[in-house]
Design a protein with these regions (language model features):
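Short, well-formed alpha-helical segments that are part of the catalytic scaffolds
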Residues: 11-24
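A conserved acidic beta->alpha catalytic loop
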Residues: 21, 28, 35-45
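Glycine-rich, basic loop-to-helix element that forms the pyrophosphate-binding segment
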Residues: 57-74
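A recurrent flexible, glycine/aromatic-enriched loop bordering the glycosyltransferase active site
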Residues: 64, 137-161
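Short aromatic/hydrophobic "clamp" motif used to bind/position activated sugar donors
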Residues: 79
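Conserved donor NDP-sugar-binding/catalytic core segment of glycosyltransferases
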Residues: 90-128
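A short, conserved alpha-helix in the catalytic core of glycosyltransferases
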Residues: 96, 150-158, 162-167, 172-201
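Active-site donor/metal-binding and catalytic loop motifs
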Residues: 115, 174, 196-219
Length: 270
């Protein structure tokens, strides 16, 4: 059904939770393709033991290069990009499939809704050790946001042909900040107008575990927000904030396909 690509950096405890949730809570058969950055914590041995395909660099390739490598191994028509600190809710794939079937073409970008560190505030733990899976499974259906416009976040699903057409993630965004809205801009330019965040497709998000883990490590670059914003601005001629407001209408309620922006006074002077 889906080829699920996941970047990971010495984060085996969370990767295991993520993979087990996919196996346990899916209706269909998927392939899981992590990209292992460094992986000196036993990650590659774990993946081989579980007969999972993966890509590997001995250095920190981070999100863009790593996901482009993993996507080359995808055998299914749809590529789902996820983080290794996600726990997938039950029937997530059935929910996504219904959305894909309703659209009936390939020009779309569908994403999920993040619980805990994301759109929905439901605390079921902030670590692998204190994650209350039972609480999440009992309460996630009653914790809701809404279907929303203009998501630029994982987990997201696009057709493999569309991924290949735009070249996947742009690798100049090292280690990754800014690459999500950049991908959306490339999709916009080839005619994608459905950028839908789906309330019922939920993942529990522990919250940028790797960024927190390596924040003070001078050898591991994990966050370059200002650099990513600058690259986007120089590349596209406007900021990420501007793109999300005037093009994607991010976080407003989903009302259907987006239209070209209304180039009024606010567009030019705000």
């Amino acid at each position: 059904m889906f080829s699920i690509i996941i970047p990971t950096l010495n984060n085996l405890k969370y990767l295991d939770i993520c993979i087990q949730s996919i196996k346990k809570n899916s209706k269909y058969i998927h392939e899981i393709i992590p990209h292992v950055n460094i992986g000196d914590d036993g990650t590659t041995q774990y993946l081989e033991k579980n007969s999972l395909n993966y890509t590997h660099t001995k250095y920190n390739a981070r999100i863009c290069e790593g996901m482009n490598l993993a996507a080359k191994k995808a055998k299914y028509d749809y590529i789902l990009y996820a983080h290794d600190d996600f726990y997938f809710c039950p029937d997530w794939d059935q929910i996504l499939k219904k959305e894909v079937d309703k659209i009936n073409h390939n020009l779309f970008y569908l994403s999920g809704t993040m619980v805990n560190n994301g759109q929905i505030d439901l605390n079921c733990g902030d670590s692998a050790e204190n994650f209350n899976e039972k609480k999440f499974l009992n309460e996630y259906k009653n914790a809701n946001f809404y279907d929303f416009q203009g998501s630029t976040w994982a987990p997201h699903l696009i057709h493999k042909d569309i991924w290949n057409k735009v070249g996947g993630f742009s690798e100049e965004y090292y280690p990754g900040t800014g690459s999500d809205p950049d991908l959306n801009k490339k999709l916009w330019d080839i005619g994608v107008r459905i950028f839908k965040g789906i309330n019922d497709f939920k993942v529990y998000h522990f919250g940028s575990i790797v960024t927190r883990k390596y924040k003070t490590d001078p050898n591991i670059v994990t966050e370059t927000g200002s650099r990513g914003n600058k690259i986007f601005l120089l590349k596209w001629g406007f900021s990420i904030k501007f793109f999300k407001k005037f093009y994607l209408k991010s976080d407003t309620k989903f009302l259907g396909e987006l239209k070209n922006p209304n180039k009024n006074f606010d567009y030019y002077y705000k």
